[in-house]
Every structure is written in structure tokens, then in C-alpha cells.
UniProtKB/Swiss-Prot annotation:
Cofactor comment text: Binds 2 [4Fe-4S] clusters. One cluster is coordinated with 3 cysteines and an exchangeable S-adenosyl-L-methionine.
EC number(s) recorded for this UniProt protein: 2.8.4.3
Subcellular location: Cytoplasm
Protein name: tRNA-2-methylthio-N(6)-dimethylallyladenosine synthase
Binding residues annotated for [4Fe-4S] cluster 1, in chain numbering: C12, C49, C83
Gene name of the record: miaB
Pfam short name (any one): TRAM
One term of GO molecular function: metal ion binding
């Protein structure tokens, strides 16, 4: 009888990626198969997120439900990972002593050993260390699940924004070696992946060591990934404006595989609030980067993150944010009411904006962005869009579903043989959360770009020219 594993995941795409790696790791090492039913599981893992308010209490409520399962199944192993685990550590077991394993985002690769120790009666295991890149060296080979895949290229953040827990829960910035990233993506391409989404808490801060001892910048990595046969689309998230340098903008001029969509969080349109947030950029600098990006890629759409009701945010500060939203014409946003995160500098500031004021501001902000998103969608009406076909539509399984370059979901009628490839579709209807279209042609009628060899891309780098952060590049001869 096979052993069963249930993983419940909260939070960002990095957590989703980590959970998929946990499943692959425990399958490869111990033969665990995933189940959607916690009652069937031999191991229950909760991968947590600490971004939202009352994250800790949410964890203990979930653990309380699992406690009942363990009462009926004493051999059940319960583990808690993710950012709340990093923050709370032993405190989790103090409040929930039936938890067997507490592990951080950087120690998930040690799960097989920790589970074995628990099952052998060696007691509970707590490991929330930051062993840098060791995690990636211990994971099994990637397995594709469709035409798109996430690939983590770096971990952590060294910016220490006053509201953010990431540096404390995932550590400072650590980049994976360039060769490791390219090898993983090449493996995925061999399995039919056509689109990769490069992940990192501050992904454009990537500075990966190379085989020759030099440093690969994020801009160089984008070109190298684009050169891998079979990879026709590249997305990445999440970016920081201060690291969105000119060499990255240049990539948008000559690398069509990088999609015409960018998520670049600004958080606020007020320089005063940005300073209090310890964001090392101004509104003018942000707008300047977007202006240069649109000169390089005129059809690009932009999304962002916004925090409303940050301590001491005045009506004038909020109006500055609304002005920025209209000037940039954001396509979408992840917008949140500010709530203090324990252990961050902002948690020591008075949370002095009334909750009703916060709610009104958030509703107004989201209303404007939703209207802008609809206008951008309507501008696509009648156009031909290239869709990466992901599978049957959730609205109608007799139809297909895919995404445009600018991340719009499109539903259309077509043969299921199109799944996993590209299709050109004429947009016939615009809805609030999706588009409808008419199939025009399949991939066999397209002239897709032929990839070049990675070494040719490397040879394009100028000798010993520092990039925007002063890191010199090495050109092999």
C-alpha cells in the first residue's frame, strides 16, 4: 500500500514552487504520492505564509483541525514549513506539541531525513536554518506538468523594506549558479515546457556564479534562457524597481521570448511614504524606468503591488498614489490594507490610519485599476493574440484555455491536440476576468524563432564592462 502525502499551501508563487519540490522530493526518496484528502495522508505538511494579518492564528486554526486526525491515527506525521515556521520556530510546538516537524523555506530538502527520524521515534524535529544554496543541490530532477513551469533562480531579499518579513523568514539574497538554472530549464524544455516563470523574492537582483568564476547578471540570464531550444516565453516575478536596470530594459528590445508583461511593485505613489517604507527609489525614478521600458517595448502592460493605509499615510499621500496609477495605467494590482507584521520596523510605528479610511481607499484604488484593466482588454478586441494553450477551459471543458503574452486568460473552441503549443486567436469578447476568441491557426503554420546557442549569447558580452551595479562581466575567448 503506497504512502500518502497531503500538502496545504498558502501564499506566493515561491511557496507553490516549494510545495511542488517537497512533493517531488518525498516521492523520489520515500515513494509518497499526493492526496487531496488529509484523512488519507500518512504525512501532512502545511506550507505557510506570513504576509497577511493574523497569519500565525490561521496556522494554529488549521493545526487544530489536523490534531483531530492525529488522535485517530497516532502514526500521522504533521509538519509546518514556510515563513511562519521561520518566524515562530519552537513556539509552534509550544502551542501545538502534536506537531512533529518545523522547517523553514531553506531546509525543505531535509524533510526525508526529518520524517524518518520522527518515524523512528527520535522525537520532534525543528530546523529553520538558512543554509543558502544547499536546498537546490538536494532536490530531485524537475518534472514538467504542462506547458508552463516555475523555476526558482534566487532566494531571499536584502532590501529590508520596513513593512516586510521576507529578509527575516527567507534570509538575504542568494543566487543559484547560472549553469544549474539553465540545466533545470533545459530539462523542462525536453519534457515539453514552452514557458518558464523565473522566481525570486527580488528576482532581478540575480547575480549567479558561472562555470568560469564570473558573475551572470539577470539580463544575461534572460538572454541565455531565451536561447534554450523549445523555450518560447519567459516570465519572471517579483521585481524590485531599484534593481530594474538599463541592461534589463535593453533585453526587451531584442529578446521577444521575454513577454510583454511586467509586474513591478511600487507600493505607494508618495515619496514620503516610500521613505518611511525604506523603499530606495522615488516616484519619479519609477516613472522614468517605465517610460524607458515602454520605449523599448511599446505594447507592454504593467502590474504592481500597493499598500494602503501605511502608518501616517495622509489623504495627500493617497491622492499621490492615485495619480501615479492613472499616469502609468496599470493593468492589474495586488493591493492590500496595511497591517503590521511582527518583527518588522514598521510594526513599531503607530498604526494611526482608521480602518474605515483604509477600506475606502482600497476600494477606490481597486475600482480605478479594474476600470483600467477593462479598457486595456477592450483595446484587444478584434486583435490576433498568440496564446499558449494550457488545457481545457474551466468554464467549459469542451473549449480550450490559454494565456496571452500580457497574461490574459482566453477561452476558445479548438482541437485538444493544440494543448501544450501555441495558437493564434482573434479576440471576440472581453469579460472582466477573461477573454473569448476564435481560433485562427496552430503552431504548425507559424514561423517561430529559431534559438541560438548559449555560447553565442555569452560571446556577445563586452570585455570587462561593469553593469549598473558595478559588477564586471567576463567574455570567454
Amino acid at each position: 500500500m503506497s504512502k500518502k502525502l497531503h500538502i496545504k499551501t498558502w501564499g506566493c508563487q515561491m511557496n507553490e514552487y516549494d510545495s511542488s519540490k517537497m512533493a517531488d522530493l518525498l516521492d523520489a526518496s520515500n515513494g509518497y504520492t499526493l492526496t487531496e484528502e488529509p484523512e488519507e495522508a500518512d504525512v501532512l505538511l502545511l506550507n505557510t505564509c506570513s504576509i497577511r494579518e493574523k497569519a500565525q492564528e490561521k496556522v494554529f486554526h488549521q493545526l487544530g483541525r489536523w490534531k483531530k486526525l492525529k488522535a485517530n491515527k497516532p502514526g500521522l506525521v504533521i509538519g509546518v514549513g514556510g515563513c511562519v515556521a521561520s518566524q515562530e520556530g519552537e513556539n509552534i510546538r509550544s502551542r501545538a506539541p502534536y506537531v512533529d516537524i518545523v522547517f523553514g523555506p531553506q531546509t525543505l530538502h531535509r524533510l526525508p531525513a526529518m520524517i524518518k527520524q520522527v518515524q523512528e521515534g527520535r522525537g520532534a524535529q525543528v530546523d529553520i536554518a538558512f543554509p543558502e544554496i544547499e536546498k537546490f543541490d538536494s532536490l530531485p530532477e524537475p518534472r514538467a506538468e504542462g506547458a508552463t513551469a516555475f523555476v526558482s533562480i534566487m532566494e531571499g531579499c536584502s532590501k529590508y523594506c520596513s513593512f516586510c518579513v521576507v529578509p527575516y523568514t527567507r534570509g538575504e539574497e542568494v543566487s543559484r549558479p547560472m549553469d544549474d538554472v539553465l540545466y533545470e530549464i533545459a530539462q523542462l524544455a525536453e519534457q515539453g515546457v514552452r514557458e518558464v516563470n523565473l522566481l525570486g523574492q527580488n528576482v532581478n537582483a540575480y547575480r549567479g556564479p558561472t562555470f568560469d568564476g564570473s558573475i551572470c547578471s539577470f539580463a544575461e540570464l534572460l538572454r541565455l534562457v531565451a536561447a534554450i531550444d523549445g523555450i518560447d516565453r519567459i516570465r519572471y516575478t517579483t521585481s524590485h524597481p531599484i534593481e530594474f536596470t538599463d541592461d534589463i530594459i535593453e533585453v526587451y528590445k531584442d529578446t521577444p521570448e521575454v513577454v510583454s508583461f511586467l509586474h513591478l511593485p511600487v507600493q505607494s505613489g508618495s515619496d514620503r511614504i516610500l521613505t518611511m517604507m525604506k523603499r530606495p527609489h522615488t516616484v519619479l525614478e519609477y516613472k522614468s524606468k517605465i517610460r524607458r521600458l515602454r520605449a523599448a517595448r511599446p505594447d507592454i502592460t504593467i502590474s504592481s503591488d500597493f499598500i494602503v493605509g501605511f502608518p501616517n499615510e495622509t489623504d495627500e499621500d493617497f491622492e499621490a498614489t492615485m495619480k501615479l496609477i492613472e499616469e502609468i495605467n496599470f493593468d492589474m494590482s495586488f493591493s492590500f490594507i496595511y497591517s503590521p507584521r511582527p518583527g518588522t520596523p514598521a510594526a513599531d510605528m503607530p498604526d494611526d490610519v482608521d480602518m474605515e479610511v483604509k477600506k475606502v481607499r482600497l476600494a477606490r484604488l481597486q475600482h480605478v485599476i479594474n476600470n483600467q484593466s477593462m479598457q486595456i482588454g477592450r483595446a484587444m478586441l478584434g486583435s490576433t493574440q498568440r496564446i499558449l494553450v494550457e488545457g481545457p477551459s474551466r468554464l467549459d471543458p469542451m473549449q480550450l484555455c490559454g494565456r496571452t503574452e500580457n497574461n490574459r486568460v482566453v477561452n476558445f473552441e479548438g482541437a485538444h491536440t493544440l494543448i501544450g503549443g501555441f495558437a493564434d486567436v482573434e479576440i471576440t469578447e472581453v469579460r472582466p476576468n477573461s477573454l473569448r476568441g476564435r481560433f485562427i491557426r496552430g503552431e504548425d503554420e507559424m514561423n517561430l524563432r529559431i534559438a541560438t546557442a548559449p555560447r553565442e549569447i555569452l560571446a556577445r558580452r563586452p570585455d570587462n564592462v561593469p553593469d549598473a551595479l558595478g559588477v564586471a562581466a567576463f567574455t570567454p575567448h
